[in-house]
Each structure stands twice: as C-alpha cells, then as structure tokens.
Amino acid sequence: MNAFDADITEHADSSGCHPLFRDVPATVEFNKLRKRLVRLTRQAIEDFAMVKPGDRWMVCLSGGKDSYGLLALLLDLKWRGLLPVELLAVNLDQGQPNFPKHILPDFLTRYGIEHRIEYQDTYSIVTDKLPETSTYCSLCSRLRRGNLYRIAREEGCSAIVLGHHREDILETFFMNLFHGGRLAAMPPKLLNDEGDLMVFRPLAYAAEDDLEKFANAMQFPIIPCDLCGSQDGLQRNAMKAMLIDIEKRMPGRKDTMIRALTNVRPSHLLDRKLFDFAGLMANGEKGSDDALW
C-alpha cells in the first residue's frame, strides 16, 4: 500500500461513504478501481497545488461519464476529509434538442448534492451562425465557457473544475504537435485571462477506460453527447484512433507519454525562448551530452 492509499483508508469517514457510494458493487475489482481513481485524482490535486482551504469549487456536470466521475471522486475525497473546499455542481443546459432536462436535477437532488442548473439557449446561436455542415463544437464551447465564468462569479466560486482526463490531454498534445506546430497540451491548472478564476483538471492522470468502467459500475444516468447532431472534429478523432493503436501495439505508452509531459528538458528542444542557446559557451567545465548524439 502506498502513501496515497494509506491516507485514503485512514481518513475514511465513520459513516462509511458518501451517499453516492452506498449501493456500489462490493467487489475486489471495483474497490481497486475506485481506490486507483481516488489516488490519481488526489495526486493531481496535490501535484498542481489546486487546494486552498475554504475555497468554493464549481464542478461542471454535463451528464457524460467523465463529469459524473469527477463529481463522485471529489465528493468521495471531501467525505473522507481530504478535500477542504466547498463543491457546487453546475450544469449548463444549452438548449440542444431532446435534452432530457429532468435527469441531472433528479440525480443531484436524490443524493443531496448542492447544485445549480442554468438554461442558456446557445444552441440556437450556434445553428444560426454556422452552416448545417459545420462542426459546432468550437463555437459552442466558447459560448459555454463564457457562461460558466459568469456563473462561477455569481456563485462566489474561486475555481471551475473540469472532467478532462489523460486521453483528452494527450489528444490535445498531438493535435497541437501535428496541426498547430507547437508543444502544448491541456494545463491541469490555469488562471483565466481576467485573473479572477482558476480552472482545474483533477482527472489529468486518470485513464478514460477506468472512468468508463467506474461510470458503468456506479450506474450514472448518462446523457449522450451527440444531441446537437454535431460531432468532434476529424482531427481529434484521428488522434484518439492513433493513441488507441499505439497502446494496443505497445501497452503502457499512454502512461509514458503523460510522464513525458512532466519531464520536459528545454535544453534538448529548439525553442530559444525557453533556453539561452546564445549564452551557452564552452568554459572548460563538463556538461551533459545525454541523448545529444
């Protein structure tokens, strides 16, 4: 048992668990999965210094497996006394056709989770401005972001918490590499342009497969992500397929890639803004030529 797992066990509440977890499968497999996800979530929170005791976090809930998992894991940590912040679950209903409006309020109320459901018909704005053949995701996400910032301020929240996981980060990295000509991924911690709100991604280390298994075991009432009829762009789908193929042929590569994003060596890249190549001069001292040849 490592330090994270030991702390999780030690801090378990005497009443057992958050109401969300009272009817979960009593299997070794689920317990291992839950413990792994809790550990990785807590590790990301600690690695990137997300917690300021007494803060109020706005947890964005779309109804997909990732955001449900995020909310459940944060509630689990808070129940154990390992996350000293307030949590507010927020869903932004963007007016997509056939959106089942009752699912999230019913779920959140049933488990006594503080929440806010906000209706803003951004779907009509998107469909009015873009042709039917376009992918709506980019404009839709910009409109959603603006509304989420507004809601966070209205609710006195210090941070917006999103459910992006390991695969989201890697896909974004390769999209930027192949199509943007830059080395960049999704930051686990970000300060917004106005400087008044943080954006956190506590699932940065969590695997999508684990989150899917977790959602199935927890029997979350999943809302499909294709209600608007638009799908993510071809570029992201291609990156997802590439990563699946790499992991299939060389198991464990996704974990290696995530570790690589935490182990950057600017002197071994070509960005003159990150390393002073012009000021690098021989002075008779030994340098490091690892991997240079």
From Swiss-Prot:
It is found in: Cytoplasm. It holds the Pfam family ATP_bind_3. [4Fe-4S] cluster binds at C137, C140, C228. GO terms for biological process: tRNA thio-modification. One of its GO terms (cellular component) is cytoplasm. It catalyses: cytidine(32) in tRNA + S-sulfanyl-L-cysteinyl-[cysteine desulfurase] + AH2 + ATP = 2-thiocytidine(32) in tRNA + L-cysteinyl-[cysteine desulfurase] + A + AMP + diphosphate + H(+). Its EC number is 2.8.1.-. A motif (PP-loop motif) lies at residues 62-67. Binds 1 [4Fe-4S] cluster per subunit. The cluster is chelated by three Cys residues, the fourth Fe has a free coordination site that may bind a sulfur atom transferred from the persulfide of IscS. Keywords: 4Fe-4S, ATP-binding, Cytoplasm, Iron, Iron-sulfur, Magnesium, Metal-binding, Nucleotide-binding, RNA-binding, Transferase, tRNA processing, tRNA-binding. Catalyzes the ATP-dependent 2-thiolation of cytidine in position 32 of tRNA, to form 2-thiocytidine (s(2)C32). The sulfur atoms are provided by the cysteine/cysteine desulfurase (IscS) system. Homodimer. The thiolation reaction likely consists of two steps: a first activation step by ATP to form an adenylated intermediate of the target base of tRNA, and a second nucleophilic substitution step of the sulfur (S) atom supplied by the hydrosulfide attached to the Fe-S cluster. This is tRNA-cytidine(32) 2-sulfurtransferase. It comes from Brucella melitensis biotype 1 (strain ATCC 23456 / CCUG 17765 / NCTC 10094 / 16M).
